[in-house]
Amino acid sequence: MTQINSQYRLRSSAFERSEEEKLVEPKKVVFLSVEGDETERTYFTHLSETLDSSIIHIEVLRHRRGDGYSDPIYVIELLQEFLDMRQGPLIPNEILNEIIAKYSDETIQTYLATPDKLDHRLKNNIQSDLLLLGIDVEYRRYLQKYDKATDIFGVVLDRDCGSHSREAMEASVKYCQEKGFHCYVSNPCFEFWLLLHLCDVMTEFEDEERRQLLLNPTISAHHTQVSFEVSKRAHHRKRISQAVFMAKYYPNIEMAIRRSQNFALHFPELFDNLGTNIPELLEEIKFPTA
């Protein structure tokens, strides 16, 4: 079976069945499709770990490694793919027909219902062929376990005026609003939200320095202006370790929310000004503040 340029992107290289077995089903799940595969994902994953898992869980949707997700359209499409999968079959019909043609209907139905009844090699072959077609069955099975009317669906986007036009961002936000998705945007980028945990941007930066934060030029092989300011205070690059999250970010979330009040918080102001509406997400999950 040859690999195809699949429209299906939901994929987790980190998924382990042991995690599924230990799962405590929460009353509400926040499903997030995020632009960055490291910074946003690790931040929200660590944040979720601090919450009462019987009440709420943040699930950051995973995509195929190597997929480009710097475009808001792709971020939104990943969330839409998840919702289509949640409301439909585990394997899309066009993929199901192709895999049945190779293995037989009986074999595939057994694989879907009681996979452990199949020969180990046969099961692995089916799984590998599905992955080639863009279908990570185990991850999809894991995601389908969450299905509450109270669940929240959102995208986390960077304004990034150097890459995304205002018109494209306006269209993305409008689409999300029409679909009932929450749209969390930081201008210029998610790292601005991180910076609010680490310092008082309004008092520590002069007007011209804040303008440079908004423009967010690339200043080295590893950093833009904002990511550099984050790195020199928190001492990490893209991936946030749990130790760094607990030391630098978690204790300062309430402070970051307060500091965000000095900047743009809502649309349309967020399109053109330094700011973030990530505090809306913290309000949705009822993050404890004084």
Predicted regions and their residues:
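Short, hydrophobic/glycine-enriched beta-strand segments
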Residues: 30-35
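Charged, often glycine-rich, active-site loop that binds/positions anionic groups
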Residues: 68-81, 126
